[in-house]
């Protein structure tokens, strides 16, 4: 009706493309809607983003969750739903994803992004990435004994508890996946137990980067 195209919408937000209109038109549109809304209801104009990426992330019967990255006029990134804003990923995973998104949104250079990722993979294989960047942080959601499937963070949490640490729901567990042929949970160690070149490069390449 107003000449904007809906790019994405959910229960509490909507993203519109200008489709020939200006930023001022968008601001005026938001103001006109607020004049018609009852009581304290208000449509907040969040910002103008020259470029962005939206990824469909299905959640079964619950539909799709928010997963997008936007670049503001000042070059700042706004990221939602990607690994860079989640805790159960290593710092190297967050760094790589944020850098790749930045290259694509600011420079529109997919080839440069690919070269960057290949360089990180080479560094992981050569063990040039420091231990602090491969530490994974995962929060316990329930008591250790209540887990039927014991993932790496649960196994490490149990070992911490055996050492006398107070561990329970809400505890943030830090671990590094190390080299070896055993199952992953048995190769996951507390950071202080891991030598600088002991982490499993292939695991981080295939599951984090």
Question: What residues fall within each predicted segment?
Answer:
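DNA-dependent DNA polymerase catalytic subunits
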Residues: 1-11, 16-209
């Amino acid at each position: 009706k107003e000449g904007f195209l809906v790019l994405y919408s959910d229960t509490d937000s909507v993203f519109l493309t200008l489709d020939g209109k200006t930023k001022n038109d968008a601001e005026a549109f938001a103001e006109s809607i607020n004049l018609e809304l009852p009581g304290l209801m208000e449509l907040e104009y969040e910002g103008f983003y020259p470029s962005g990426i939206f990824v469909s992330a299905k959640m079964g019967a619950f539909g799709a969750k928010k997963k997008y990255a936007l670049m503001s006029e000042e070059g700042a990134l706004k990221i939602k739903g990607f690994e860079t804003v989640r805790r159960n990923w290593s710092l190297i995973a967050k760094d790589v994803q944020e850098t790749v998104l930045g290259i694509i949104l600011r420079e529109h250079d997919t080839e440069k992004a690919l070269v960057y990722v290949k360089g990180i993979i080479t560094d992981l294989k050569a063990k040039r990435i420091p231990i602090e960047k491969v530490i994974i942080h995962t929060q316990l959601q329930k008591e250790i004994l209540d887990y039927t499937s014991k993932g790496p963070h649960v196994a490490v949490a149990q070992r911490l508890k055996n050492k006398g640490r107070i561990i329970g729901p809400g505890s943030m567990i830090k671990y590094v996946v190390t080299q070896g042929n055993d199952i992953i949970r048995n190769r996951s160690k507390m950071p202080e137990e891991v030598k600088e070149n002991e982490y499993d490069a292939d695991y981080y390449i295939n599951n984090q980067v």
